[in-house]
Amino acid sequence: MIGEDYNWKVQGERALAIYDEMRRSDATVSAALDVVKYPVISTEWDIDPASDDQADIDVRDFVKECLFNIVDWSKFLDEALTYLDFGFVVFEMVFEPRVVDGATRIALTKLAYRKQTTIQRWLTEDEQPGVT
């Protein structure tokens, strides 16, 4: 997104600093964010299999193990919902071999949060700006 902001003074690092200050010090902004975030955080999450086939049930069980037992799901939700504060959020997915249900599998072991204030830009595969 380049040049689409209504207020051109609120861009880049300055925008992130303003958003961070607003969410931390403005009670109205903080309350509005909480109203949206709390229902998501307090929801009991589950995963349904794609079908009743045993293969789909096994996939569901593996995904549940990764997301709810290996990865800290509540921490992920807290961090993921910061997209509401800043307009975007980035995670690095980390995979490692793990024994799950007696079999060694490549499992999602971490969703590493990359704080918005540490990201200034990145390039896409065609070397065009992704976020500027």
Functional labels for PLM-detected ranges:
Residues G3-T132:
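Structured, mid-chain assembly/scaffold modules that mediate subunit interfaces
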